[in-house]
């Protein structure tokens, strides 16, 4: 396509114009991704399999003018896909065949119906949303229910994976109403200028339509524009400019009244800029209407997230009903749409049935008892930790919001917690805590990274002088900015482990809540909460295996350009698999593979050696955060780094047996029990359910394991995919080992959804995000007219490196500070 188009919306429009012109007579027998690929059931009758077409671009609802831009589109044959070869692949007769193109083609064909249905909103290549039942999320957003669809090859059959999904969209209304909803201001109120930055970020790239300008025929001319920011940081009534047409300086309201006979109802609102950096165009928001079907790409606020979870939470029966009912209809699969016929595609409208097994839960051991597991959980009543940690004293910091509630007896609360620790088998000094500090933190609208550090840091400095092993911090709010500052100060700046508790909860002195906080206390002081008997550890009981968890977390929407990704590696060190110290690094933004893996593995191997007096004979790696398309990259890039770390640590003959298992948790496979006796109270599969046939890979070893019991809604199993295995695991052996590990998550009294090494790796990466919180959550003044320059990205990366320093303090490197 020449000239090149980078904007997806425009590229899609070019393909739409092609469908209506060059391919008008063939619309029913072609499918496209509206980006660069066209799929046809047979070869097009064009000379030399190549065709060049000039098209004139115009937006939907507009007409071609003399200024309309022209594009040269080249269509050429790039590949012939043989369905027979794909069938041989799924039948197990052609392992060397690459199914990628066939899968892509089938996905494009299946997406044609929902993509072209005016009642459906496509979002990405595989999600399609129904625009008939919007649920309010607040702050100008709504949640829409949609359906995910993707082709999955399995043994002897090709499957279509369908699942329900929900996403936030901008509410379809005028932009003035949207502004009032987002800011929480009453209609007619003035918006404080200090909110303009955040408002601009919310509106940036939002597409709107206007109709205040009349065309040659005298009728309103509908124009589509994109908002690039907030205009001039002032209300419309306060903006004046020299108008050549009226030969005088006029305000925005005066101009629209004289030019278009429009009296602005909200002159106190800021204008939206729909121009460019060099040539801004200001529009009063009340004359702009949000175009439908625009997904919100930034991070939701806590309250919005809570609403989203409520809407998305459906029991298994209801979830399955949506899929086979509204889902298949929305996707054009039931009844099947005509476009499937030319491709000779038929999709069954019934869910497939697959075999499953339920693994037996392990025995949970404490110092004084074994616990019965019921529904994948147990309680802490009258038990002592398997190995209680000791400390003569601990510090307490009480954070209070300025003007907050009256002072409670925090010394009494802390003493109650001390007693709970001792009751649970820890040894905490009878006079603890001797160190207590109360700290007032700024009001929410006055909080910044700098103001929070200024308020809280002196308390840590005071504590550091007294050298407590650990500090208990009472938080007055769930504000992540406050939590992140506490963790930054404790982990990075002062090197003191911290445990946070919500003031509103711990002040009630509930034994259950106190006991749960004590779980973290004991682990961070290098104790052991519970364990499994040797029989349930299997080969792990030999004491020669190090289990590793790896993950990478990337900047979230709203982060400043160039903000680094964070890589984390955790590894077991003891025979009970209770302690998992970690290595943590910044790396290039959005890089999937772990750059510093060799050095991080060396740190983990050296720590294992210092505890055990030898290096492990086996290494089992659970790698989180990797998509299917990157499995081979892990083998090619990360496996050699692990081997190199081993060679550097041991002698020349040191060659531990390495296995790498990818942990998938963001997939769309769900299971619905056919037998009520094999279901839990919600109708989900019983904890311990494992599926390794029917929906798994054709040639490789993978399985789905639901080790946990869901609290609500439809549970999602973890997907484990073995990409390298020199330990020669039998399928049941690895499944049982992974399942039993899920009962060893130290800070819970239940089995967890993914095995602890992957879970801990995720947690340590999340902890790293606290250290660069300000970059990951850009302030209101973040550039709205960003140049997206490499210089800007480099500056932000450098700032992150400065905040990060050397990362977690040396005092904490051998502890589970990240819990």
Model feature map: region roles:
Residues 1-819:
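Long, low-complexity, intrinsically disordered terminal regions
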């Amino acid at each position: 396509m020449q000239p090149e188009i980078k904007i997806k919306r425009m590229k899609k429009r070019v393909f739409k114009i092609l469908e209506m012109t060059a391919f008008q007579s063939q619309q029913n027998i072609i499918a496209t991704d509206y980006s660069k690929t066209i799929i046809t059931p047979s070869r097009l009758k064009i000379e030399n399999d190549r065709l060049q077409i000039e098209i004139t671009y115009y937006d939907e609802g507009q007409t071609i003018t003399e200024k309309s831009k022209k594009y040269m589109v080249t269509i050429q044959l790039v590949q012939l896909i043989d369905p027979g070869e794909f069938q041989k692949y799924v039948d197990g007769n052609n392992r060397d065949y690459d199914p990628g193109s066939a899968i892509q083609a089938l996905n494009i064909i299946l997406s044609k119906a929902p993509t072209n249905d005016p009642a459906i909103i496509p979002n990405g290549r595989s999600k399609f949303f129904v625009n008939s039942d919007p649920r309010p999320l607040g702050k100008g957003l709504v949640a829409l229910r949609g359906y995910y669809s993707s082709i999955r090859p399995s043994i002897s059959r090709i499957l279509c994976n369908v699942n329900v999904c929900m996403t936030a969209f901008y509410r379809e209304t005028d932009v003035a109403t949207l502004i009032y909803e987002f800011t929480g201001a009453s209609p007619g109120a003035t918006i404080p200028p200090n909110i303009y930055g955040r408002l601009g970020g919310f509106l940036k790239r939002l597409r709107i339509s206007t109709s205040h300008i009349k065309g040659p025929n005298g009728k309103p001319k509908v124009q589509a524009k994109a908002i690039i920011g907030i205009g001039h940081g002032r209300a419309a009534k306060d903006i004046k400019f020299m108008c050549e047409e009226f030969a005088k300086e006029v305000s925005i309201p005066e101009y629209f009244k004289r030019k278009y006979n429009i009296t602005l109802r909200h002159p106190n609102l800021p204008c939206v800029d729909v121009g460019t950096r060099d040539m801004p165009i200001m529009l009063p928001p009340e004359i702009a209407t949000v175009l439908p079907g625009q997904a919100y790409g930034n991070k939701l606020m806590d309250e919005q997230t809570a609403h989203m979870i409520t809407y998305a939470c459906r029991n298994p029966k209801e979830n399955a009903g949506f899929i086979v009912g509204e889902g298949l209809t929305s996707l054009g699969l039931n009844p099947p749409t005509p476009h499937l016929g030319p491709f000779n595609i038929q999709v069954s409208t019934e869910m497939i049935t697959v075999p499953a097994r339920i693994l037996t839960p392990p025995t949970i051991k404490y110092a004084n008892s074994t616990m019965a597991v019921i529904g994948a959980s147990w309680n802490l009543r009258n038990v002592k930790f398997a190995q209680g940690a000791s400390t003569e004293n601990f510090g307490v910091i009480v954070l209070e919001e300025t003007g907050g509630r009256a002072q409670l007896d925090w010394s009494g609360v802390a003493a109650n917690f001390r007693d709970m620790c001792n009751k649970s088998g820890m040894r905490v000094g009878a006079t603890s805590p001797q160190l207590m500090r109360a700290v007032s933190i700024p009001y929410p609208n006055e909080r910044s990274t700098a103001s929070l550090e200024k308020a809280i840091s002196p308390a840590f400095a005071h504590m550091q002088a007294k050298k407590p092993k650990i500090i208990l911090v009472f938080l007055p709010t769930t504000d992540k900015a406050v939590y992140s500052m506490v963790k930054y100060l404790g982990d990075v700046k002062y090197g003191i482990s911290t445990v946070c508790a919500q003031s509103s909860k711990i002040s009630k002195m509930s034994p259950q809540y106190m006991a749960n906080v004590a779980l973290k206390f004991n682990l961070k002081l290098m104790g052991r909460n519970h364990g499994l008997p040797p029989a349930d550890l299997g080969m792990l009981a030999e004491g020669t295996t190090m289990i590793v968890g790896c993950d990478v977390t990337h900047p979230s929407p709203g982060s400043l350009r160039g903000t680094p990704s964070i890589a984390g590696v955790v590894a077991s060190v003891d025979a009970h698999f209770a302690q998992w110290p970690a290595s943590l690094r910044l790396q290039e933004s959005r890089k999937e593979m772990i750059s510093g893996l060799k050095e991080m593995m060396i740190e983990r191997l050296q720590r294992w050696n210092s505890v055990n007096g030898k290096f492990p004979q086996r290494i089992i790696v659970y790698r989180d955060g990797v998509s299917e398309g990157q499995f081979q990259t892990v083998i090619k890039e990360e496996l050699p780094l692990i081997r190199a770390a081993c060679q550097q640590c041991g002698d020349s003959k040191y060659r531990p047996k390495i296995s790498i298992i990818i942990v998938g948790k963001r997939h769309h496979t769900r299971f619905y029990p056919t037998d009520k006796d094999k279901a839990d109270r919600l109708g989900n599969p019983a904890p311990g359910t494992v599926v390794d046939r029917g929906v798994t890979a054709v040639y490789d070893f993978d399985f789905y394991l639901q080790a946990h019991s869901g609290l609500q809604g439809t549970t999602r199993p973890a997907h484990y995919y073995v990409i390298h295995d020199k330990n020669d695991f039998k399928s049941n052996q690895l499944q049982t080992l992974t399942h039993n590990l899920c009962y060893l998550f130290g800070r819970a009294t239940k089995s967890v959804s993914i095995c602890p090494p992957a879970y801990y790796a995720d947690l340590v990466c999340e902890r790293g995000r606290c250290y660069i919180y300000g970059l990951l959550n850009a302030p209101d003044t973040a550039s709205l007219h960003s140049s997206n320059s490499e210089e800007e990205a480099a500056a932000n990366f450098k700032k992150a490196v400065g905040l990060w320093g050397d990362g977690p303090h040396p005092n904490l490197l051998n502890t589970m500070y990240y819990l």
